[in-house]
């Protein structure tokens, strides 16, 4: 048993926000009240700290199988725990791609060994070929939670329509990476900074928002649910808002990096700040924040994309892979760039990092209640920390190294067990 004493208990589902004690027995919260006494329990003094549901991150790359020099499921789970994350959804762009039941079962067997809750998407198309839709029914029955070709945009409208119909038939949804290759230049560099400083055509805004426009309208026609991944453009927020007003089943996420900083960071942090979609302009950054405030964007998800140091340490930045390690900085970026400036309340931030992503997938997570799951994060919301290369992840490809950010995770509890510090 674990007894958490005197913390500020915050639950986005019930809107509870009060200093209280939380008693955990096994994998459940058994009591939330003031002044709980339990002699046999391990006591955690949470005075002055926030006690919240464990974070739910629905967009991570754990690189297993096939790319475990970057990350593996075990180190990914450690990184999640260090960041206060107790539930994750992995993407399917492994090697081999999670397109068949056999590969899916191998990945889930590895995930089951970890102490946090690890789910995975399967791919929409076979090995990301963009042509042949996978067996949704068989993959769902084998444990996939949804479908995404994340990392590779789905170019064929015909295939997308087929996938939406299949998703509907199986009561699921599709998540999409929106960057039309035919309208894009060099990935990872926003078009403005690409032209001005690097003198080539970069990743354009129209490549993102035009593809979103196509996809939300096909989803509208098919009455299918589409989830837009890591949108980054002001116009993308407007397109999603329009589709939602029309009655389309559209949800959207934003990554912390896109509400925290801009393309200029490429000139300072180099390849660590190269990602898809790229860091954009201040106008775009403020627009995605407005999307979070208005409720157009309901989910914050990291797109945790670890890479080996040697892969990122190259003379030609265009040759470096895109992506950044994100699980261990996401809460701090939210506190620093959303809560501290007054864009979101702490409760609203927690809602977008816990309850909303859990509801999207139907997970029993993202809330604190008696008889509910004992998945919690305990953190100091005002305390500053210096971001260093000392990550639990195998990777340290973060453009935020050297930054002072708000928020220090003190304890992460998953299934009633303290998993950080471990």
Curated annotation (Swiss-Prot):
Catalytic activity: (S)-dihydroorotate + H2O = N-carbamoyl-L-aspartate + H(+)
Entries under InterPro entries matching the protein: Amidohydro-rel, DHOase, DHOase/Allantoinase_Hydrolase, Dihydroorotase_CS, Metal-dep_hydrolase_composite, Metal_Hydrolase
Active site residues of this protein: 303
Claim: Zinc is one of the keywords in the record: yes
Binding site for Zn(2+) 1: 59, 61, 150, 303
EC number of this enzyme: 3.5.2.3
Signal sequence, start to end: none
SUPFAM superfamilies: Composite domain of metallo-dependent hydrolases, Metallo-dependent hydrolases
A molecular-function term among this protein's GO annotations: zinc ion binding
Record-listed substrate binding positions: 61-63, 93, 276, 307
Cofactor: Zn(2+)
GO biological process terms held by the UniProt record: 'de novo' UMP biosynthetic process; purine nucleobase catabolic process
Family membership noted in the UniProt record: Belongs to the metallo-dependent hydrolases superfamily. DHOase family. Class I DHOase subfamily.
Protein's name according to its UniProt entry: Dihydroorotase
Species name: Streptococcus pyogenes serotype M1
């Amino acid at each position: 048993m674990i007894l958490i004493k005197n913390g500020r208990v915050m639950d986005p589902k019930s809107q509870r926000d009060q200093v209280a004690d939380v008693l955990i027995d096994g994998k459940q919260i058994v009591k939330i009240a003031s002044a709980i006494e339990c002699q046999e329990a391990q006591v955690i003094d949470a005075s002055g700290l926030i006690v919240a549901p464990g974070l739910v991150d629905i967009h991570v790359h754990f690189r297993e199988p096939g790319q475990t020099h970057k990350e593996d499921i075990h180190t990914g789970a450690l990184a999640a725990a260090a960041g206060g994350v107790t539930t994750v959804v992995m993407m399917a762009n492994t090697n081999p791609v999670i397109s068949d039941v056999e590969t899916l079962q191998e990945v889930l067997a590895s995930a089951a060994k970890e102490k946090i809750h690890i789910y995975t998407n399967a791919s929409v198309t076979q090995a990301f070929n963009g042509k042949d839709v996978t067996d949704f029914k068989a993959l769902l029955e084998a444990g996939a939670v949804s479908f995404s070709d994340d990392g590779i945009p789905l170019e064929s409208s015909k295939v997308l329509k087929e996938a939406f119909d299949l998703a509907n038939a199986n009561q699921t949804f599709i998540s999409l990476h929106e960057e039309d290759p035919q309208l894009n230049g060099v990935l990872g560099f926003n078009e403005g900074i690409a032209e001005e400083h690097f003198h080539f055509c970069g990743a354009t805004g129209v490549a993102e928002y035009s593809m979103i426009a196509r996809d939300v309208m096909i989803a509208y026609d098919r009455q299918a649910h589409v989830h837009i991944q890591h949108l980054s453009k002001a116009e993308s927020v407007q397109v999603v808002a329009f589709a939602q007003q029309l009655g389309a089943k559209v949800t959207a996420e934003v990554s912390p990096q896109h509400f925290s900083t801009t393309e200029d960071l490429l000139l300072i942090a180099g390849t660590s700040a190269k990602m898809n979609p790229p860091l954009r302009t201040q106008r775009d950054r403020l627009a995605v924040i407005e999307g979070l405030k208005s409720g157009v964007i309901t989910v914050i998800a990291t797109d945790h994309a670890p890479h080996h140091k040697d892969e990122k340490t190259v003379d030609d930045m265009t040759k470096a892979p895109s992506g950044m390690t994100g699980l261990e900085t996401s809460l701090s970026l939210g506190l620093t760039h959303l809560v501290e400036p007054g864009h979101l309340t702490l409760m609203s931030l927690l809602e977008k990092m816990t309850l909303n992503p859990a509801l999207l997938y139907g997970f029993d997570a993202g809330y604190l209640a008696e008889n509910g799951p004992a998945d919690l994060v305990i953190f100091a919301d005002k305390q500053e920390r210096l971001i260093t290369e000392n990550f639990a992840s195998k990777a340290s490809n973060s453009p935020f190294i050297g930054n002072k950010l708000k928020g220090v995770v003190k304890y992460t509890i998953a299934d009633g067990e303290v998993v950080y510090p471990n």
